Amino acid sequence: MAKIQLVAQANLPTEYGIFKMVGFEFLDTKKEHVALVMGDISNADEPVLARIHSECLTGDALHSLKCDCGFQLATALKQIQEEGRGVLIYHREEGRGIGLINKIRAYSLQDKGMDTIEANLALGFKADERNFEVCADMFELLGVKKVRLMTNNPEKVETMKKAGINVVERVPLNVGENRYNTKYLDTKAKKMGHYIVHNNDEQHLMTCPHCQEEII
């Protein structure tokens, strides 16, 4: 088990209901992660609706349309609210682990024509620098053994299984596609094996506020 510990918790009222915010910290690096917990998750035999959400300042806080992160965060919290119980782990690995400034550098390369993977490689990073094992450690500290994991990323599922977390179901999270992120989603599907279902059909183009200006 990684050297991470549960260090603080408090109630957090949100537009999706009241969550318990749980803070975790690595003993050596002092790096922090957070989990949002709703309802009673103490029954280890009952699968918990869960989401591992990697930090994305641009999508989560600044409402960027270049990715689907902000849409996934909102949808996951709403689904937990509807379920009445669940866990969202906020995984502090900005920019797939390369950090915010390098993410901006990667965006600059994408403006010049590279895709999201090519940009990371050009900067000297792997396609994905994240380590999801710490998320399994956080689940364990929360007493969660079985999850219904909201994700399109097969690596998250496999990492949880290898770490001893029983993923009984993968819940798709295909939301937020628009004309600014279709290439990004396509790249994740083709080069990273993500389970992406495109929504760029005629009905989507007619109803999506981010696509309408393209067809007027």
Curated annotation (Swiss-Prot):
The keyword Signal does not apply. It holds the Pfam family GTP_cyclohydro2. GO terms for cellular component: cytosol. One of its GO terms (biological process) is riboflavin biosynthetic process. GO terms for molecular function: GTP binding; GTP cyclohydrolase II activity; zinc ion binding. Binds 1 zinc ion per subunit. Its EC number is 3.5.4.25. It catalyses: GTP + 4 H2O = 2,5-diamino-6-hydroxy-4-(5-phosphoribosylamino)-pyrimidine + formate + 2 phosphate + 3 H(+). The active site is at residues 128, 130. Transmembrane segments: none annotated. Belongs to the GTP cyclohydrolase II family. NCBIfam families: PRK00393.1, ribA. Catalyzes the conversion of GTP to 2,5-diamino-6-ribosylamino-4(3H)-pyrimidinone 5'-phosphate (DARP), formate and pyrophosphate. This is GTP cyclohydrolase-2. The gene is ribA.
